[in-house]
């Protein structure tokens, strides 16, 4: 697999990665940004940096509504950027305002994976506040189903199940080159 930088079409201002937790947004985003010669921006990392505490701590201290408000502020900020690959948090697309801003900001790519794959990928992770009390496949499936209508709003959808990060990046760059 070639690792050289490719040129994104000039019509591609940003690439926005959406998807449920554990679908590969961060891993794919970092490599995709490198391949495109874009900057990489992780919304959750921006929030943590701005607040000075972890996502878990934000949820524990202030609750999900406060976190979602911070997330919308971060979306507003990155939507003004150019030549950036943005990895959103899994729930960022729940907000109609966020979906609108993200669509205007660039090409929205939704990464998916099977429930089983997400469970496998998240098995050892402890920084997922919405799964802290229930990490079951049933809980994950229910959350994925609740969000499906919002994820489906993407320009491109890629199932990452069983694929390497490189393969997913190649699918995205192939799409962008043909756009």
Swiss-Prot record:
SUPFAM superfamilies on file: P-loop containing nucleoside triphosphate hydrolases
Pathway: Metabolic intermediate biosynthesis; chorismate biosynthesis; chorismate from D-erythrose 4-phosphate and phosphoenolpyruvate: step 5/7
Residues annotated as binding substrate: 44, 68, 90, 147
Enzyme Commission designation: 2.7.1.71
Note on how the cofactor is bound: Binds 1 Mg(2+) ion per subunit.
One of the record's GO molecular function terms: magnesium ion binding
Keyword ATP-binding belongs to the record: yes
Binding of ATP, residues: 22-27, 128
CC per GO annotation: cytosol
ATP-binding keyword on record: yes
Subcellular localization: Cytoplasm
Reactions it catalyzes: shikimate + ATP = 3-phosphoshikimate + ADP + H(+)
PANTHER family with a match to the protein in the record: SHIKIMATE KINASE, SHIKIMATE KINASE 1, CHLOROPLASTIC
Function: Catalyzes the specific phosphorylation of the 3-hydroxyl group of shikimic acid using ATP as a cosubstrate.
HAMAP family: Shikimate_kinase (MF_00109)
This protein's name: Shikimate kinase
Organism: Geobacter metallireducens (strain ATCC 53774 / DSM 7210 / GS-15)
């Amino acid at each position: 697999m070639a690792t050289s930088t490719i040129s994104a079409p000039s019509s591609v201002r940003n690439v926005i990665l959406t998807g449920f937790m554990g679908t590969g947004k961060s891993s794919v985003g970092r490599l995709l940004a490198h391949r495109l010669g874009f900057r990489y921006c992780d919304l959750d990392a921006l929030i943590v940096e701005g607040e000075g505490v972890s996502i878990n701590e934000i949820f524990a201290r202030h609750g999900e509504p406060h976190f979602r408000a911070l997330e919308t502020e971060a979306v507003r900020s990155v939507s003004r950027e150019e030549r950036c690959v943005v990895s959103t948090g899994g729930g960022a697309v729940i907000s109609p305002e966020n979906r609108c801003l993200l669509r205007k900001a660039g090409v929205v790519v939704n990464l998916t994976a099977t429930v089983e794959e997400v469970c496998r990928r998240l098995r050892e992770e402890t920084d997922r506040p919405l799964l802290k009390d229930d990490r079951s496949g049933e809980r994950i499936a229910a959350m994925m189903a609740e969000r499906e209508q919002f994820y489906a709003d993407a320009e491109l959808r890629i199932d990452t199940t069983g694929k390497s990060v490189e393969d997913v990046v190649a699918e995205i760059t192939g799409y962008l080159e043909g756009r």
